[in-house]
């Protein structure tokens, strides 16, 4: 008997098959017999008795086998209670779709109290509950199913809160099965909630709803039902969801009455829950049919769309398969005829052809590796990952320029010409480079020292490297190591890694196509260091001429001869370069450009190139020398000329805007610019070109910029044209012709020192000379900064005077070294004053305040020692120092003057401030003598060994110190 009950339950597994049986007009279903009934038109009948009898027999059989689990039940439910007597039911929330009469719906009940109540109902032979759809929360889309989150929030609701979230109209459902928390419901008839009876579990009073009376023979009703039946049959035929039961459904669908037909159509549709709830709530059968017709029509359109998409995809897949098969057949036919070889043979032939021309120059160990890899390639399947790795490896091995060298040019006169073409000034740097080339001419090769160009940003280090490559007729390749922290960037990845690649040097050789390029390693002082190793240590093997003969890249894993490669490095601060690397380099310092050199560069190179780049003709604009001089001295004091180029570009952009507003239209100048270098770009490949003419010494790598600008002034002047420019603009507009010619009569735009601020804003740097005649206690010193040289005033003032209370107060953001220099200066000054004026007790009785403007700028260094002594003595004796005098030098406790650095920069700063007399340490005389004559011209320079000589120069007019 138990087996019979289980068999009966198995027959109920397909929900829609059971629906067919329940929805027919009182005629028993062949599939379900009389085991299930449709609740809306049944009372205590023979069907109920049969169901009860079958269930009783099943329970007796299960009791005979053993005690059943309390939470489990068979699919056949005893229903001794009359369904019309169900006026108070437990409310079950349905989160996703309403339950229609005649349909089964499985739900999960997480609330143990509710689950226990359902089990108790079944035991009392009253297995009924009310199933009500849950309303959406405000602001949610009913078309989006929120899943377990919404179910969890519903489970937390109790009593009135849950009642508010339920739709009033639901379905009286029979509890057909309970397995754990899994409950299966069978819908019977429509209900409406009237009031709440109990809060937990939620129990409500309900009214049983009946359809409104209708005329079965109404033509409109019949036509609508026929259309619904026709559409349903079409949906069932086209939908993949019901394809296994198409024959059964379409056979019995015509037997449904109107109300059950409407419920059936709405239940199998994929409409959202609100539309389905609307069908459930509709008691007018005709309106319900119309609503269902809309839903099934939409379902049919969706089914057709789904079918068309599936068909298109299937056709595409079959078409691709057909093409693939035809291609394979074609390959096989060609192979049989000898017209085509397979991929592996073609690849091997390509690699052998590449290496054939280099066989005589290629090292034997490399040829051996290539042959081994070619043999390995033939044994691998083309679809394997190892095949791809081997193919890429062979590609790199065969593409490298083994033994291919470019012819070098060691002509010193040719090199001198190129260096002069590309750069103005820098005579000492050019001389060092020519010496290097001369040694290469005598040796026949440039193998040897590694050049390191050091200097501030914008002085032309990178472009000098290009010029050397042009002079030697070598290919040029640049890569920056600034911030590089991965050794694999230099030495490559091992082939075992996915996506492995060779290092930069192997990529360089492939890019330039020669084995002796000039490689510029930019920003070598900014090498990083991370968990992936130390790149500085990896560069040791690369740069050392004794080791790079057999440089081993991790990817290639064969020795490569890099001894013919000329390496040029650039750095801003050589102190940041690791000592083992620095020891292998020949340092060439590039101090920067003086004002005269900047004037020539701006006039001959920068202005000309910028004017052409902006499309402006020479007759349309004039930038005077006074404007360029003011631009250099008041806006661009840095050692390089990169910022000067930016300011000139800003001027010409504003001029271009004025000309366009005046209606000027120039034909573009078509100038061919050819390049002879290969330069690394961010992530792209390098390119090799010929005969580049680079005349802009400011062109250097863009990864380091250290220019001082005034952002506020720049922004303001970028947005507004000047009043002077506006006047010229209006004047030019007044002079325009009316004949429509391309070149219209305009007034020439002139930029001079008077209107320079209208184009580039207010000056960034103010005049360094504060005093025309230095007062008592004030002396001008000379300092070195990152921007070059500058003048520096030392000011002293007596704060108070009390016997025996001599002291020194320091301000001006002085560093530790400068504070120590001030203490030494105070001691030495006291000794000098005691020697010169024994009766003057100024230092013993006076508290002196020493200040170094500007207060916001940090300052440090020992070179202001002699200036501090002179300032204190001037205050102590009440004498001002000699006019137009500036000095620099470190002083010892015994009054000796020690050498300092930055002689060139400090001399330029003195000339800029119109200083005529300079005092330097005697040890710096050689540095001063090496300066260009135009830098030294017009200066009276004294070189001193002791402070007593400075005292005579500063406070007496009959000094006899050595003068230059």
From Swiss-Prot:
Reactions catalysed according to its record: Hydrolysis of proteins in presence of ATP
- Locations listed in the record: Mitochondrion matrix
**Pfam families named among the record's database cross-references:** AAA, Lon_C, Lon_lid, LON_substr_bdg
Q: Where is ATP annotated to bind?
A: 455-462
Q: Where is the active site?
A: 863, 906
Enumerate composition-biased segments (Basic and acidic residues): 688-698
- Enzyme type, top EC level: hydrolase
* Position of the signal peptide: none
SMART domains noted in UniProt: AAA, LON
Tell me which residues make up the Lon proteolytic domain: 773-957
Q: What biological processes does GO assign it?
A: cellular response to oxidative stress; chaperone-mediated protein complex assembly; mitochondrion organization; oxidation-dependent protein catabolic process; protein quality control for misfolded or incompletely synthesized proteins
The region called Disordered is annotated at 663-740
| UniProt entry keywords in alphabetical sequence | ATP-binding, DNA-binding, Hydrolase, Mitochondrion, Nucleotide-binding, Protease, Serine protease
GO CC terms of this entry: mitochondrial matrix
Q: Is Nucleotidyltransferase a UniProt keyword of this protein?
A: no
Give a yes or no for keyword Mitochondrion in this entry: yes
Query: Could you tell me which residue ranges the Lon N-terminal domain spans?
Result: 89-300
Classification via InterPro entries: AAA+_ATPase (IPR003593), ATPase_AAA_core (IPR003959), Lon_bac/euk-typ (IPR004815), Lon_lid (IPR054594), Lon_proteolytic (IPR008269), Lon_Prtase (IPR027065), Lon_prtase_N (IPR003111), Lon_prtase_N_sf (IPR046336)
Q: What does this protein do?
A: ATP-dependent serine protease that mediates the selective degradation of misfolded, unassembled or oxidatively damaged polypeptides as well as certain short-lived regulatory proteins in the mitochondrial matrix. May also have a chaperone function in the assembly of inner membrane protein complexes. Participates in the regulation of mitochondrial gene expression and in the maintenance of the integrity of the mitochondrial genome. Binds to mitochondrial DNA in a site-specific manner.
What name does the UniProt record give this protein? Answer: Lon protease homolog, mitochondrial
């Amino acid at each position: 008997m138990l087996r019979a009950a289980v068999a009966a339950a198995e027959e109920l597994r397909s929900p829609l098959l059971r629906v067919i049986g329940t929805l027919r007009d009182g005629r028993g279903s062949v599939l379900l017999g009389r085991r299930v009934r449709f609740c809306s038109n049944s009372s205590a009948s023979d069907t109920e008795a049969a169901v009860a009898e079958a269930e009783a027999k099943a329970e007796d059989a299960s009791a005979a086998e053993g005690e059943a689990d309390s939470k489990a039940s068979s699919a056949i439910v005893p229903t001794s209670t009359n369904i019309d007597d169900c006026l108070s039911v437990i409310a079950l929330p349905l989160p996703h779709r309403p339950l229609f009469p005649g349909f089964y719906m499985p739900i999960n009940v997480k609330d143990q109290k509710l689950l226990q109540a359902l089990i108790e109902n079944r035991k009392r032979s009253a297995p009924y509950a009310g199933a009500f759809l849950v309303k959406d929360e405000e602001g949610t889309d009913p078309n989006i199913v929120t899943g377990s989150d919404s179910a969890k929030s519903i489970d937390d609701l109790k009593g009135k809160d849950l009642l508010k979230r339920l739709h009033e109209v639901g379905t009286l459902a029979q509890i057909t099965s309970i397995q754990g928390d899994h409950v299966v419901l069978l819908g019977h008839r429509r209900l409406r909630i009237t009031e709440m009876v109990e809060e937990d579990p939620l129990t409500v009073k309900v009214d049983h709803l009946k359809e409104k009376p209708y005329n079965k023979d109404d033509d409109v009703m019949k036509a609508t039902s026929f259309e619904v039946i026709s559409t349903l049959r079409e949906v069932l035929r086209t939908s993949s969801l019901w394809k296994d039961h198409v024959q059964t459904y379409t056979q019995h669908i015509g037997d449904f009455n109107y109300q059950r037909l409407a419920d059936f159509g709405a239940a199998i549709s994929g409409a959202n829950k609100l539309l389905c709830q609307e069908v459930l709530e509709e008691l007018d059968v005709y309106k319900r049919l119309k609503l269902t017709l809309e839903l099934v029509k939409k379902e049919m359109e969706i089914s057709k769309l789904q079918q068309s998409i599936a068909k298109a995809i299937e056709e595409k897949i079959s078409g691709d398969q057909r093409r693939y098969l035809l291609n394979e057949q074609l390959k096989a036919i060609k192979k049989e005829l000898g017209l085509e070889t397979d991929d592996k043979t073609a690849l091997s032939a390509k690699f052998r052809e590449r290496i054939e021309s280099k066989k005589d120059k290629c090292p034997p160990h490399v040829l051996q590796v290539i042959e081994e890899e070619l043999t390995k390639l033939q044994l691998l399947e083309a679809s394997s990952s190892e095949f791809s790795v081997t193919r890429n490896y062979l590609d790199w091995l065969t593409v490298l320029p083994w033994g291919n060298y470019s012819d070098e040019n060691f002509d010193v006169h040719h090199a001198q010409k190129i260096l002069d073409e590309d750069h103005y000034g820098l005579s000492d740097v050019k001389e060092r480079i020519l010496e290097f080339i001369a040694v290469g001419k005598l040796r026949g090769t440039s193998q040897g020292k590694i050049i390191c160009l050091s200097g501030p940003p914008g002085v032309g280090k990178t472009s000098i490297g290009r010029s050397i490559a042009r002079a030697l007729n070598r290919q040029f390749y640049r890569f920056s190591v600034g911030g590089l922290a991965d050794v694999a960037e230099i030495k490559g990845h091992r082939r075992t890694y996915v996506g492995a690649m060779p290092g930069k040097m192997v990529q360089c050789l492939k890019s330039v196509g020669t084995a002796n390029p000039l490689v510029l390693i930019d920003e070598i002082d900014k090498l990083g260091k991370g968990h992936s190793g130390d790149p500085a240590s990896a560069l040791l093997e690369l740069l050392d001429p004794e080791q790079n003969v057999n440089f081993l890249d991790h990817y290639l894993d064969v020795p490569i001869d890099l001894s013919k490669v000329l390496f040029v490095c650039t750095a801003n601060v050589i102190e940041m370069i690791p000592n083992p690397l620095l020891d292998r380099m020949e340092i060439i310092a590039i101090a920067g450009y003086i004002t005269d050199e900047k004037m020539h560069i701006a006039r001959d190179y920068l202005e000309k190139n910028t004017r052409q780049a902006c499309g402006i003709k020479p007759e349309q604009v004039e930038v005077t020398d006074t404007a360029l001089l003011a631009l250099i001295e008041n806006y661009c004091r840095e050692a390089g000329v990169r910022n000067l180029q930016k300011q000139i570009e800003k001027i010409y952009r504003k001029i271009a805007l004025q000309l366009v507003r005046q209606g000027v239209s120039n034909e573009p100048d078509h100038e061919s610019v050819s390049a002879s270098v290969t330069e690394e770009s961010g992530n792209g490949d390098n390119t090799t070109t010929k005969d580049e003419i680079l005349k802009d010494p400011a062109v250097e790598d863009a990864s380091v910029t250290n220019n001082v600008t005034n952002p506020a002034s720049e922004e303001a002047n970028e947005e507004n044209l000047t009043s002077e420019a506006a006047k010229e603009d209006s004047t030019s507009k007044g002079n325009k012709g009316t004949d429509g010619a391309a070149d219209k009569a305009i007034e020439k735009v002139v930029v001079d020192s008077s209107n320079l601020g209208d184009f580039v804003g207010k000056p960034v740097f103010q005049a360094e000379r504060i005093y025309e005649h230095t007062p008592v206690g004030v002396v001008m010193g000379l300092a070195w900064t990152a921007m070059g040289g500058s003048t520096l005033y030392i000011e002293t003032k007596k704060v108070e005077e009390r016997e025996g209370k001599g002291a020194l107060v320091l301000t001006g953001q002085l560093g530790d070294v400068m504070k120590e220099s001030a203490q030494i200066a105070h001691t030495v000054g006291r000794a000098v004053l005691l020697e010169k004026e024994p009766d003057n007790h100024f230092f013993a009785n006076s508290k002196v305040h020493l200040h170094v403007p500007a207060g916001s700028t940090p300052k440090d260094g020992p070179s202001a020692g002699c200036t501090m002594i002179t300032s204190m003595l001037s205050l102590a004796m009440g004498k001002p120092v000699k006019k137009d005098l500036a000095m620099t030098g470190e002083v010892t406790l015994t009054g000796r003057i020690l050498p300092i650095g930055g002689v060139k920069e400090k001399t330029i700063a003195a000339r800029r401030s119109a200083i005529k007399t300079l005092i330097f340490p005697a040890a710096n005389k050689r540095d001063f003598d090496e300066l260009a004559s135009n830098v030294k011209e017009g200066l009276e320079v004294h070189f001193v060994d002791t402070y007593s000589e400075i005292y005579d120069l500063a406070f007496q007019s009959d000094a006899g110190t050595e003068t230059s």
